[in-house]
Amino acid sequence: MKNESTFIDVPADSSSAMKGKAPLIGVAKDHTASGSGGYNRGLSIFDFLLRLAAIVAASVAAGTMFTSDETLPFFTQFLQFQAGYDDLPTFQFFVISMSLVSGYIVLSLPISVVTIVRPLAAAPRLLLLVLDTAVMGLTMAAASSAAAISYVAHNGNQNTNWLPICQQFGDFCQKTSGGCGLFLCRRRVFHDPGCPLRSRSQRH
């Protein structure tokens, strides 16, 4: 009695095709993820460097305004002519705001480092964007009011009979104007970190 055997033909192309397709899909996914991670890491490093520059600019702006005291060489028996940042609440607000901004940027550096270590994490980037926007509103309010007072100190106001004082207090006006100018540099530096994140969000 003969043994009967059954043969099943399995196409060789099907298994090889499936084996060939699987690695290709995996390689494509890994390549896309690595490319996106590298792009985000580069933006995070750029953001970190800009924050360091913003710390320097904000600190120098606050220090320049804080040391803007000037006393005129002449005085009377009852009066001494002196000008300082603490004589004007607007300049006090500027110094306090710049100090708070410097402290905030220092505290935001660890979050910026997290975005470098984990470039694909969206939560730290979103948190920085929200906080940066709030701080930008504070700094804009402080600088715009300080710039307005500095303009009046330089040019005066004929309608209200406010006389310009910069002809007498030259050093005081130079330092206050320098503080406002440094703020413009700090604003530009501090505004840029949010731009890469917004452009990245628009792409998605």
From Swiss-Prot:
Keywords in alphabetical order: Cell membrane, Cell wall biogenesis/degradation, Membrane, Transmembrane, Transmembrane helix
The record's Pfam families line, in alphabetical order, gives:
CASP_dom
List cellular component terms (GO). Answer: plasma membrane
A GO term (biological process) for this protein? cell wall organization
Task: Check the record and name the InterPro entries matching this protein.
Answer: CASP/CASPL, CASP_dom, CASPL
How this chain sits in the membrane, per its record, is: Multi-pass membrane protein
Localization, per the record, is: Cell membrane
Does the record bear Cell wall biogenesis/degradation in its keywords?
yes
Q: TM spans, by residue? A: 42-62, 93-113, 126-146
**Coiled-coil stretches noted in the UniProt entry, renumbered to this chain:** none
Please indicate the ranges of residues that lie on the Cytoplasmic side: 1-41, 114-125
**Where, in residue ranges, is this chain on the Extracellular side?**
63-92, 147-204
Q: At the top level of its lineage, which domain of life is listed?
A: Eukaryota
Which family does the record claim for this protein?
Answer: Belongs to the Casparian strip membrane proteins (CASP) family.
> What does the record give as the function of this protein?
Regulates membrane-cell wall junctions and localized cell wall deposition. Required for establishment of the Casparian strip membrane domain (CSD) and the subsequent formation of Casparian strips, a cell wall modification of the root endodermis that determines an apoplastic barrier between the intraorganismal apoplasm and the extraorganismal apoplasm and prevents lateral diffusion.
Subunit structure of this chain's protein = Homodimer and heterodimers.
Protein name (Swiss-Prot/TrEMBL) = Casparian strip membrane protein 3
From which organism does this entry originate?
Raphanus sativus (Radish)
